[in-house]
Amino acid sequence: MTIYSYLLLLCMVMFVTFFTQKNNILSLMVVLESLMLITLSSVAVSLNYMAGSSMVMILLLCFAAAEAALSLSLLVCFIQVNSSCEMLAMNKILFAKKS
């Protein structure tokens, strides 16, 4: 098996894990970050075969860092508002009946 096969298998496992996480937002964010890093590593492996593409790798790394910072800031704001990182608290906010 090549490295692409391993990365594809790992990506599928993380994709299934993403949809089975229902209790904690923090674990959901960790799985989402690992999916992003798997995608980044597969792009890095594919760009390794091309010459002169180091700028694309730096750009992708910047996007991954910005995505991680955004998700962490959203999680911190959510925990400050609800004092909990449980998915049940998010469901109460999103699906609350307005009178």
From Swiss-Prot:
State the membrane topology: Multi-pass membrane protein
Enzyme Commission number(s): 7.1.1.2
Q: Which UniProt keywords apply?
A: Electron transport, Membrane, Mitochondrion, NAD, Respiratory chain, Translocase, Transmembrane, Transmembrane helix, Transport, Ubiquinone
Its annotated function is as follows: Core subunit of the mitochondrial membrane respiratory chain NADH dehydrogenase (Complex I) that is believed to belong to the minimal assembly required for catalysis. Complex I functions in the transfer of electrons from NADH to the respiratory chain. The immediate electron acceptor for the enzyme is believed to be ubiquinone.
The record's subcellular locations are: Mitochondrion membrane
The residues that cross the membrane are 1-21, 25-45, 56-76
Reactions listed under catalytic activity: a ubiquinone + NADH + 5 H(+)(in) = a ubiquinol + NAD(+) + 4 H(+)(out)
Family, per the entry? Belongs to the complex I subunit 4L family.
> According to its UniProt record, where is this protein mainly located?
mitochondrion
Specify the species: Albinaria caerulea (Land snail)
Q: What is this protein called?
A: NADH-ubiquinone oxidoreductase chain 4L
Which lineage? Answer: Eukaryota, Metazoa, Spiralia, Lophotrochozoa, Mollusca
Q: Does the keyword Mitochondrion apply?
A: yes
- According to the UniProt record, what class of enzyme is this? translocase
Cellular component, GO annotation = mitochondrial membrane
